[in-house]
Amino acid sequence: MHMGSEQRPDEIDLLLPANWPTAEQSAPVFLISEPEPKVEPQPFRRGGGAHALELLVALLALVLNAWRLDQNGFGNSYYAAAIRSMTHSWKAFLYGSLDPGSWITLDKPPGAFWLQALSARVFGYSSWSLLLPSAVCAALAVYLLTVTVRRVWGTTAGLVAGAAFALTPVVVAVGRSNNPDATLMLSVVAAAWATERSITTRRVRWMLLAGAFCGFGFLSKLLVAGLVMPGLWLGYLVAAKPPFAKRCLHLIAAAAVFAAVSLSWIAVVDLVPASSRPYIGGSTNGKALDLALGYRGIGRLTGATEFGAPGGGGRPGGFPGSGSLTFTVDEFGGTTGIGRLFNNGMGDQVMWLAPIAAVSFLAALASAIRRRTRDARLGSMVMFGGWAAVTYVIFAFINGVFHNYYVALLAPALAAFIGIGAALTRDAGRVGRVLAALSLVGTAALQIFLVHRVGTYGWVGTAAAIAIGVSVVGLVTTLASKRLTSRRALLSVGLAAVAVLIAPATWSFAGTTHPQSGTFPDARPSLPGGATGLPGGLGGGPGAGRGPGGFGGGLDEAMLTWLRAQQTTQRWIVAVSSAMQASSALIAGDSVMAIGGFSGSDNTMSPARLAGLIDAGELRFMMTSGGFGGAPGQGSGLSTVVRSTCAPIPAETWGGSGSSGLYDCAGKSAALRAAPVPAANTSQAPANTNGGPSNPGAFEKCMQDNGAPAPTGNGPGGVNINDPAIARALAACAGLFGGGGSFPPGAAPAN
């Protein structure tokens, strides 16, 4: 394969001077390479030792992701509930419906969940079948990154990049959950692989395939997939061989493919009449386009929040925490700023090797400037550099809803530069070896800080520092030699790679030893006593070892047994306010309607529409605890109508005690249609700007009355929101929060 001898940069190139030499004509001297190794993609030789090692790295990733996978239960209960429903009917599968009756969908396109639902259909619905697709996707992403880096920078670089990627804790975490991030990660890495293929083969079809891969990433997690596209597109623009005008046309075509794939599901959904399909969760008008461009799309970047509408299961906020641990994690990203990704929640998940990645980028940039050549290495450097820069800046300063595990999207680019750094160090001159040694020293300091900040596994920091120190000494002792021999170079690079991966590997392996949160996946040693906090100080449960599942509250099992016995022709056995109340029942196979979607804020129901469902025999029972979702005022208004119109079911009827909040609306359709919808009742809960309960004493009593331990202090500090009893109590007590009987805007734990 020829990289520069057949065609010079065209004369109309607007990015690089037309007189830049080709790779074979350029001066080979640069900052850390004396001479520069030949820039030729290394062919893929099947059956070779390098191929076996690449597969071994991918296998390591798969083992890490799949080891004791069933201890994580069903992962994120919100998504697990939808997967159960998607196995029930192909209609639910197509739309990504939360419930088997297809009343409302998930608040994301179903791309990633199609894979999980297919797995559940083939292997049966179980913990393994739900979580295995993510494990496989993460392992495939590792393999593709290894190949992508190896083709341009050599076998050593590819293997080091793959190992660094596989052992990044957040990669292991998302690979062991049913969140869509592993599928997104595979999609964008595949797009980078296709982009690199397009640059080296000079075939535009690979660039079109890159657009398609990014499009599927959009179908998995909306616009976040677009964060990698500027880097990929710019890498092709500066390094591909066709004339500049053709390159631009190629990128326009790739963007068109991206748009076509991205909008395919949106078009299919929105062309179907609203009466014939489920409401699109997370939208303001029931349309898929609004989901993509609204709160869940552009709103995530601008800081927009969804309605904190009446609904159960949300996360109260605005209180000081009461925990005594020194290491706490804000699962919502913490304070914005340039150092955000080094905070407690993200630093030990993705930033272990940041100094090496930064120095490697600068070295690769210097190489490109010195060589003045448009080739595959320039494209690779720009592609991964743009990916890392755009993603880091957006994640550091985004004001919208943000979770720590989102940084998995940054991991492939950082790992690529670890591999690139290994290649440059292997072929480096004296100056390059000095820079490599300095980057190792910086990495050792960072790793010691990250380990000791957590307050456990302190020996890991010491061991990593010693190993890195030995590798630094090894590099320094070679300075007397102008060049490294091949054997000494590989030994130096290999020792350094092993040394810097000790700490992240320990964190990754530790993450497999105990159950992980389905809602907030991470990989780190189990922290005794609980060390995970939420904004406003809502204390965590059992720390990083918290049990599987999400915020699922749930319906009492005795109540569900009674409701099942009452079901005749009804499509839904009961309607509740939010997915957090419905998830456990949906996972068990019951058809429960979550009127307000994820957090109870979707406006899907009115008294008239409820009356129509009752007349059609599709719904009979309503659960009013926590109110029903909708825009401000409408949810609590519907709850008021149901309470005043339908017949209450005493808890003793189904073997419970206290107030059940269950109502029988059979035969009440006429009264429901005639009932006025009152405004939200704010007299008992005046406006509260900080999102806390207007009457903490009443909130504490409400929690106790609903079977939960009393929160301490001035808020719910120290409670475990993954405990179903706690979640049910929070749902029942939502009316004591400001804003008309609702959680404050953005307080419900957005996913």
What does each model-found stretch correspond to?
Residues 88, 120, 172, 514, ...:
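Sec-exported extracytoplasmic/periplasmic mature domains
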Residues 44-48, 321-347, 545-569, 691-698, ...:
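Intrinsic low-complexity, intrinsically disordered segments
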Residues 675, 679-751:
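Cell-envelope/extracellular polymer assembly enzymes that use nucleotide-activated donors
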Residues 276, 284, 514, 604-613:
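Alpha-helical scaffolding within the catalytic cores
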Residues 3, 428-529, 553:
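Transmembrane helical bundles and short interhelical boundary loops of multi-pass, membrane-embedded
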Residues 79, 111, 128, 191, ...:
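Stable alpha-helical elements in mature extracytoplasmic
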Residues 2-435, 442-446, 510, 598:
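Membrane-integral, polyisoprenol-dependent glycosyltransferases
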Residues 502-600, 615-641, 646-665:
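Short periplasmic/luminal acceptor-recognition loop of GT-C membrane glycosyltransferases, typified by
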